[in-house]
């Protein structure tokens, strides 16, 4: 009975060590992933702002043209 408890304790100990090593590797990989994700998010927001600015400019030009034609001042 005692030898069975010792072997189970050794297996548990080895499993815990291997699990902690895997978690450390995973955390190291996630740290690298966070940097690229932040960069992607930065690029995405930049493209989004450029797109919004372009749409606002186009909408403003369209509204100016429509108001000119409605008022017949063109």
From Swiss-Prot:
Tissues and organs where the protein is expressed, per its UniProt entry: Expressed by the skin glands.
InterPro entries, per database record: Antimicrobial_frog_2, Frog_antimicrobial_propeptide
Keywords: Amphibian defense peptide, Antibiotic, Antimicrobial, Cleavage on pair of basic residues, Cytolysis, Disulfide bond, Fungicide, Hemolysis, Secreted, Signal
Entry keyword annotation includes Transmembrane: no
Propeptide positions: 23-39
Protein family according to the UniProt entry: Belongs to the frog skin active peptide (FSAP) family. Brevinin subfamily.
Protein name: Brevinin-2MT1
